[in-house]
Swiss-Prot record:
GN (gene name): gyrB
Cofactor entry: Mg(2+); Mn(2+); Ca(2+)
Record protein name field: DNA gyrase subunit B
Main location per the UniProt record: cytoplasm
Subcellular location as annotated: Cytoplasm
Signal sequence, renumbered to the chain: none
Additional detail: Few gyrases are as efficient as E.coli at forming negative supercoils. Not all organisms have 2 type II topoisomerases; in organisms with a single type II topoisomerase this enzyme also has to decatenate newly replicated chromosomes.
EC numbers for this chain: 5.6.2.2
Coiled coil regions, renumbered to chain: none
Amino acid sequence: HAGGKFDGGGYKVSGGLHGVGASVVNALSTELEVFVHRDGKIHYQKYERGVPAADLRVIGETDRTGTITRFKPDSEIFTETTEYEFDTLATRMRELAFLNRNIKLTIEDKREHKQKKEFHYEGGIKSYVEHLNRSKQPIHEEPVYVDGSKDGIQVEVALQYNEGYTNHIYSFTNNIHTYEGGTHEVGFKTALTRVINDYGRKNNILKDADSNLTGEDVREGLTAIVSIKHPNPQFEGQTKTKLGNSEARTITESVFSEAFEKFLLENPNVARKIIDKGTMAARARVAAKKARELTRRKSALEVSSLPGKLADCSSKDPAISEIYIVEGDSAGGSAKQGRDRHFQAILPLKGKIINVEKARLDKILSNDEVRTIITAIGTNIGGDFAIEKARYHKVIIMTDADVD
């Protein structure tokens, strides 16, 4: 292998897993050429299937510095395809440009469908958060940006809250996307929850009678990037999608909490909006818990008294039973006349049902029609979902395809 990562002067930080990148590309290519512009000279060497075709030689003079590598993937090894997807590569280039502020990356496709993209972001991960939130409604205009370092570990965090109900946290170590999170992400989440609760208490936004906001509460509507540079990262598993260094947690927590506390003190209006958002999430969480409990029925016999006017079938065997969900009483009447009451149940729904994609759980579960469906089918929802409790093995939704 090239061994670049093992020599202390080579890289300040690296992926740190294999240290064999160039060597692997060389071994998997029919040919590979390297042009190194250095010390006023252009050095060149060509390889064929991993073996040098000739010795390293100087082929010219230059006033530039840098390396050009060309390679052709070996179709005998990559039997399915040797075609590169422009969009896949461009997405990764964009990600790297966001993670390394002020770097300029250009990707050009010189094949039949010629295209070229250039990525350069002066705002770095702050611009990344703005990019991710571009189609959302932020509750504070400027993303919060934090950077600092301790014991040789550099920490960068950018975050912005929006009006939505989901959170998106993306963490990176040495430019590697740690999909499964890890210690740096845990440190960030811990600090975020603690700092918001502390600020809320000190400024009397959270009253004595109020419970502390949970991690889920304070992360509702959050988009965040956590990027650290670590000289000796320890990844869990060969895919390096999770960071394992224990010190990464304490350093990320310390750097972020100190800067975020300062930010909240200097921006009381934004702080208020963030805590109000978390408080609403907490109320919704409590309401959803109560609503969920309302949907739990002790037995299937209670279904007959539901407001949804369920006309149940006489069979108690779910394997042959089916339920037809129809629009309104008029459709319900026709369906009841045409059904086989032995195994076909009819559930007429009235009014326009709620759009569950755009509503919070407490709102969804306070909707009579939704509760009727949950109780009639019998499986419950969320963490309590149990498919074996289904009262019908076929659910047929008979509605017209308009907006409601």
